[in-house]
Amino acid sequence: MQAPPSFYEGDTLVVAKKLLGHKLVHIVDGIKRSGFIVEVEAYKGPDDKAAHSYGGRRTDRTEVMFGAPGHAYVYLIYGMYHCFNVITAPIGTPQGVLIRALEPVDGIEDMKLARYNKTDITKAQYKNLTNGPGKLCRALGITLEERGVSLQSDTLHIELVPEEDHLSSTHNIIAGPRINIDYAEEAVHYPWRFYYEKHPFVSK
């Protein structure tokens, strides 16, 4: 079952924690690639100095952040790595949640090919398959083509995981500072990164 539009509404910190344990799904050439979300970061622009939309900054890149919740915000870092975010909060409030890491579930062979151009990989390579925002986008085939796509689409969405299979039943959720935002002054210390304690696919 796909997460309904109402799932993405409300406080961004609440939505960030709600996303943990559910599946990010991308259908590529008819093949389902997915993973359990195990690490996220919340960004609460325009007051959050770590957010692309800090100060209400509105550009072609960030325009989707000002739209309806439940859409994909994809951007490129270092000119080569894609990052996938879920838009939250009401229209006109540019906030979102970065998906930082996944535990691979469906389409793992295709994900291996996408990341390493081979399926015979080492244990270390498998652990590195989706344990970072750029890595998971490469594995799932998420690019700038997905920017602005509704997460109600057949090909890109969040799939709700039943309570009995949910990782939150076996893992504690930890809150801490976000990663790689040294430029963000006091926002560096906001405990807006949420992840499953000791999960092997958490990025750090």
Curated annotation (Swiss-Prot):
Any matching Pfam family: Pur_DNA_glyco
Molecular function GO terms recorded: alkylbase DNA N-glycosylase activity; DNA binding
Signal peptide location: none
Coiled coil spans: none
Record keywords: DNA damage, DNA repair, Hydrolase
Enzyme Commission designation: 3.2.2.-
InterPro entries, per the entry: Formyl_transferase-like_C_sf (IPR011034), MPG (IPR003180), MPG_sf (IPR036995)
SUPFAM superfamilies, per database record: FMT C-terminal domain-like (SSF50486)
Any GO BP annotation: base-excision repair
HAMAP family, A to Z: 3MGH
PANTHER family noted in UniProt: DNA-3-METHYLADENINE GLYCOSYLASE
Family the UniProt entry places it in: Belongs to the DNA glycosylase MPG family.
Name this protein carries in UniProt: Putative 3-methyladenine DNA glycosylase
